[in-house]
Amino acid sequence: MCGIAGILNLMDREPPRHEEVDAMVTQLQHRGPDGYGYFLDRHIGLAHSRLSIIDLAGGNQPIHNENKSVYVIFNGEIFNYIELRAMLQGAGHRFYTASDTEVIVHLYEQYGLDFVHHLNGQFSIALWDANDKKLVLARDRVGIRPLYYTVNNGRMIFASEIKSLLANRDVPRRMNIQALGEIFTYWSTLTPNTLFENIWSLPPGHMMVVHKGQLNTHRYWDWTFDTDKPADDLPLQEWARQLKSLLIDAVRLRLRADVPVGAYLSGGLDSSVITSFIKHYTDTPLRTFSVSFEDSEFDESEYQRELIKFLGTEHTNVLCRKADIRDNFPRAIWHTESTILRTAPIPLMVLSEKVRKGVSV
């Protein structure tokens, strides 16, 4: 994962300073340890912390178009970027990188705000149209990638994490009491609320356009269930075939990377199915990772071992003890930027720290 951060002036005031956006993006180094990139002009400051996955040498952000009138910083991955790139090149667009980020730039040139409808991926995007002095923020359909923002002192400030916003001195630190009540009721805040007052999350499947000092947010995608249409009367085997086809296609697209790919194994059905597909559609040895527990009530190592033996993966297991959960709880709160009411996220965080030493996808 990468990290993005930015400052946009909503009124006439001093331009964003490099040290301001640098302070924000420094808070995101754990998301993108492979380098920082910046763009600043009179109106906006953009910063990006990069985790290199596609186009390791040439994919540094911000990415711009041919005449440098459109700039993009982006956290995530566009799975259908190869097909989109070919289509855009056929329409006359010229690329200077092999990255999936540049596809977003040229899609915007081609389709305007409808560019987002062409994306198959997980993403949070910030796009600056320098000619129109317009900022576009967009988040993927189900909100896999985070994006937060606040408005204060004539500025709109946004970032991948709240701690990045708080690194800016214009952003006050006040608890949102209503959001705290939501956490103890629903185990989570209700979007767009966060645990911090006047800091909001851009909802999944939404786009925000900031133009002439106005923030306009709209939903560009939603779940659709046609209740008036009768269900197809198909045998169970056909439904299973269609589901398998969709899963295979989803896994195949997500294997596009210029770095090694690994898989988590929980011992459950979902991770077992996905890992089996990955193993089938990759030529290189597959590394798998799992977490085990001292308490047999929570441990599923037996099921993990069965699949590891069946697939022949290169496996790494991490034993998470009760003391590990206790010791890592404060750091988990720092990462989640919210109240944690259960211990489940901590073992996954401990495992992820082990994984990131050799695998980033």
Located regions from the model:
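Cysteine-centered catalytic environments shared across enzyme families
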Residues: 1-337, 348, 352
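Substrate-binding/specificity loop regions of serine endopeptidase catalytic domains
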Residues: 342
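Short, intrinsically disordered, charge-balanced linker/junction segments flanking boundaries
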Residues: 356-361
